[in-house]
Each structure stands twice: as C-alpha cells, then as structure tokens.
Amino acid sequence: MLNPTVRKFQYGQHTVTLETGMMARQATAAVMVDMDGTAVFVTVVAKKKVKEGQDFFPLTVNYQERSYAAGRIPGSFFRREGRPGEGETLIARLIDRPLRPLFPEGFLNEIQVVATVVSVNPQVNPDIVAMIGASAALSLSGVPFNGPIGGARVGFIDGQYVLNPTVDELKISKLDLVVAGTAGAVLMVESEADLLSEEQMLGAVVFGHEQQQVVIENINALVAEVGKEKWDWAPEPINQSLHDRIAQLAQTRIGDAYRITEKQERYEQIDAIRDEVISTLLAEDESLDEGEIIEIFSGLEKKIVRARVLAGEPRIDGREKDMVRALDIRTGLLPRTHGSALFTRGETQALVTATLGTARDAQTIDDIMGEHTDTFLLHYNFPPYSVGETGMMGSPKRREIGHGRLAKRGVLAVMPTIEEFPYTVRVVSEITESNGSSSMASVCGASLALMDAGVPIKESVAGIAMGLVKEGENFVVLSDILGDEDHLGDMDFKVAGSRNGVSALQMDIKIEGITREIMQVALNQAKSARLHILGVMESAISQPRAEISEFAPRIHTIKINADKIKDVIGKGGSVIRALTEETGTTIEIEDDGTVKIAATSGEQAKQAIARIEEITAEVEVGRIYNGKVTRIVDFGAFVAIGGGKEGLVHISQIADKRVEKVSDYLTMGQEVPVKVLEIDRQGRIRLSMKEAQATQQEAAETSSEDPAN
C-alpha cells in the first residue's frame, strides 16, 4: 500500500512541498519536490560495497528536463529527449558542487543522484528545486552525508535583496546569485551581476544563507520522521607506522621540490620522489598496497605546502600571498580574425578570438522554460597539450562547459545591447597553457579580444582566482592561485569585474568555519589583484577600436513601412533571395520593418539599400519612371515600375499618333520611360509613354534655352 509522507512549508514567496514514499521505492531514497508548480523528482542509489581497486569517490549527479513537464513534445527527429543540453549540464554541476565536500574522506561507495524535471511553472526555475530535492534524498538515504544543504537564488531589485525571484523578476534584477550551504556554513556560490560592489555581493551570500535555513529545518524534520537508518561506516584506520616511514623517506625532499618554481620540473621531481618511495617500501614489505602509499604521500604533500603558507613562507613559485604572476598581453595577433588577444599570466595562457556575425548567427535555445535567442556566445576549450599531456579530443566536457559559462558571466555586464551593436558576437578561448585560473584568464582575454574587434564594451573586465588555507583561527588568503594551491586549499573562489564592480563571483568552500569576515578579506584582496590586472590590460588596449575589422560584416540598418515587408520578401522569398545573391549581402527583416543589411563592403550595402528603397518606394502621380514591359495585351501593355508595382499603359497612351497594334511599338522586356497619370481607389496605376516623352522633351528644351548652358 502506497503511504507517502508529505511536508509543506513557505519559502519566501513560494510554497514548497516535499513528498517521499510514493515512487521509486527500489531506489535508496526518492523525493518529489514541488515549488509552486515546478516539480522535480530526485532519486539516490548508493552501492553498499566498494568496487575493488576503487581509489576515488564515484559520485554522479544527473539532471534531466522532460518536455512533457512543459506540456510539449520534443522537436527532434525521434521526438524524444536526447543527450543533456548545456543548461542541463550546468545545473548538474551546480547541484554536485555543494554536495561533494559533505561526504567523509575515505568514503568510496558509488552514488548516483538523478533529478528529473516532471512539471514546470514558467516563472519558477527548476535548478533550486532540484538542489533541494538532491539534499533531501541524500539525507533520507542513510549514507554517510554531512548535510542537509539548502539552496537559494538571490536577486537585487531596487536596492533590495529578493529571495528566489521569478523569471520575470530576474529580467529586471541586477543580480542572479545561487548560494548553497549547511546550517552552519556556506559551501557554494555561483553568480552574475551588473557590476555590484563587493559589499553588496557578500550581503547577498549572507542573505541567501540565512533564508535557506527553513529548507534545512524541514529536511531534518522529514528525516526524523521517515529517514533510513544511518549506514554503519567508518574510515579505514590510519597506518601510523607507514605514515611515519613515508615522512622519514620523503618529507625533506618534498619540501625542497616545492621550492622549484617551474611547474613541469617540479612535477618531475615529485614523481621521482614518489616512485623512489614506492620502490623502497615495496622492497621492504611486498604486502603493502601501492594505492595506500600514494594516498599517504599525497597527504604529506598537502600538509607540507599548507604549513609553509600558514608560516608566512614564500609560495610554491616564490611569490608573496597577495602577488599576481607576471602578465604578458598581446592583441591583434591573428590577421584574419575579427579580434584576437593572447593573455599570459605566469604559466596560464589563453588565446582568445572574437567573431562578429549577423542575427541569423544567434543561438536559439529551446528548453522547457521556453525559447529564447542568445546573441553573445563564449566557448572555452581545454586541450590536453595545455598541461603537457596527451588525451582524447572531442566535444566539450562538463568542466569546459562550466568554465565557459563562468567566463561569459564575467563579461556579460559590459556587453552592448543588440540595439547599440546589432551583431551576434562569439568569443572562443583556447587554453594553450594551464597552471591555475584558466577561466579567469579567459575573462581577461575576452575583454581584450572584444576591444580589438571594435565591440563597444562599456569598460574592461578582468578575472582573478583566489585561494584560502585555514587551520584553527589562523588563515591566509592567496591571490592568483596555481593549480596545486587550488587542490591543496580550503576555499577557491573566482571574481570577475571592472573598476566599477563585480560581474561574476564563483565560490567553492571545502570546510566549515569560513566566516563573513574571512570572505570580506578575500574579496578585498581579490579587488586589489583585479585592479592591478586591469591596469596592465588598459596599457595594452584601453578602449574598443574605432572601426571593426575589414573582414567583419558591416551591418547597416534602415526602416521600411511594415506593410512593404511582403514586397521586399516576394513570393516564396524570390525577391529577397535575388537581392542577396545579386548584391552579395545578407538581409534580415524584423516584424516592425527594421531591415539589417550585412555586407563586407560599403558598395555592396549601398546597392542593397538602393534596391530596397526602390522596391518600397511609394508611387507618385506625375513622376516619370523607367519601366519594363512585362505583358502585352490588345488594349495596351503592363509595365513594371519598381517596388513590385505594375501599371497599365493604355494603347492610346503609347504614342502621339494612333496605334493599331501594340506589338508594333513594344516588345516583352523592353525598357521604356512612363509617367504616372493616376492611381485609382483600388490601387490600379495608369501610365503614359507619350506624356513621359512630352515631359522629357519639354525639360530638354528648357535646359537648352538656359544661358548657363
């Protein structure tokens, strides 16, 4: 007998319902979460046994949107959902990031979280709903999980923070920030902002964390009521004698190796020490597990580096805690691209290009929240050679999609509107070297490449990655972290922005006890680093180039009467197709009569504009046109006079004398001057060849009598 347990609570302006016990009863745990009509069904399956040889924690989070949730049938050929889209991948990462640090070290059992959107209210984003569901399902499952977590979206409208703003409210919000955390700690922040201050950003984080406590309280209450028994799990006991022996063999040498500033040389030295330790220990005792030796060795590395940082010693590459690595900036280095830049910060390097296209190059995104068009694209590629490795090349992985979206958030606030700059813009960041903070290098490179392309961005933006090492009350914030410092630290966060404020903030915290004061110190230190980088960038290029590249399309905009759109398009698109082919341009027409002509030369654009103006021009009574005979009939001839207009030259209006047979005077396709005599109420046009001839003759005689001639 199905006996669901339901819990309902108010969360800001929304009502949230948690329900369990109705569906997916063979899963370890399952929860249906509903927030005002947006419902996400979340399941957790956890393996009781660890796979043999497993040396990492195999947590998988899958997020999938079903078209039926929005009352639609998929538009694909097979009429069913395919592989996850970019949006689904980003939300899966958003859920994964705050959950992963809450599993105890040494827990290696496989866990899969599946979140399926089954109903959607177009005003309520499903990502926060899915995050709440994942937290609830894991908490109910009994697995060793130090949750639950809450999730909240924070907007900033009219100077006030707004909890879980609707889709319409987000359109007018200066902030879109998602924060997740436990009852006592913030774990994850993901945001984009319209150049807000550090204080406003931090205030939003604190506000969201405070407001989400109601979610945590209700999940705890649900667990108390129907939660499964906690697993009887404990970490493997520490082999202290092996720890001591490895420290004896390697501690001093590891410390010396981490004084080598060049990454590849340092890695080679560490690898050599590790291999020697493994060989020595296995020679002493063949029963030892190589995986355990490597794990203890890695822990010793982390301990040594952290102790040096906390003691105030120079960092791995010799820098002080607040120093940014050496910068090298070059722009315009690729001759045929529309804009390019090479941004190098230490051993991290990004080759970034900007390409300008027309409206038809925009990306149409059709998901369960509706269809929308994106005219600014930023793609991030991380090839294996950037870290001196070999590997598979193919479609972008989750990490590349996530880093690209973060970099895009960092630049979005300074991009011009489509009205200010009617181009689709694509930025591509190729990471050619990597040793920490390649996504923030992409922000810097994107800003430089956009300026090089002549895109009128409001101001330069730069990004910086920060780290934190904390033991007890002692903590050190590190600016511009290396890859090793990211791995060994307790918090890493990335801040992008201009001189006037923050455009993007991403934060991942691995420990509890990170206070508001620590985050404030970190944000202030990040601001100093960002301003330093901006200064160097502005010395390379301080404002967008006055002209776009000669290889980029020029977009010219004209306005026509909306009633004339059909004339420019023609039957079956015949007129506009001929226009584009004959002038070598791309023409786009909007419903309000706005016409955008993209051409690589000014002459092409002039030709297209002249043709369109000719087509859409109103026929004037008394004006003489050069027409073309399109049809000959017994009583006269029909003549096209441009603009898709055609008029009749009656047989009596062909010549001054009597005309017996029209074909004696006119042939098909013949070009003749005609004068508009009348346009009747039905729009029919009466033309005259003899009146046109008389008017032209009179004008010629007047001209010859003019003394100036």
UniProtKB/Swiss-Prot annotation:
Family recorded in the similarity comment: Belongs to the polyribonucleotide nucleotidyltransferase family.
Catalytic activity: RNA(n+1) + phosphate = RNA(n) + a ribonucleoside 5'-diphosphate
Source taxon at top rank: Bacteria
HAMAP family found in the cross-reference section: PNPase
GO MF annotation list: 3'-5'-RNA exonuclease activity; magnesium ion binding; polyribonucleotide nucleotidyltransferase activity; RNA binding
GO BP of this protein: mRNA catabolic process; RNA processing
UniProt subunit comment: Component of the RNA degradosome, which is a multiprotein complex involved in RNA processing and mRNA degradation.
Region (Disordered): 690-709
Gene from which this protein is expressed: pnp
Bias type Low complexity, positions: 691-702
EC number: 2.7.7.8
Keyword Metal-binding: yes
PANTHER family named among the record's database cross-references: POLYRIBONUCLEOTIDE NUCLEOTIDYLTRANSFERASE, POLYRIBONUCLEOTIDE NUCLEOTIDYLTRANSFERASE 1, MITOCHONDRIAL
Functional summary from the UniProt entry: Involved in mRNA degradation. Catalyzes the phosphorolysis of single-stranded polyribonucleotides processively in the 3'- to 5'-direction.
Name of protein: Polyribonucleotide nucleotidyltransferase
Species: Proteus mirabilis (strain HI4320)
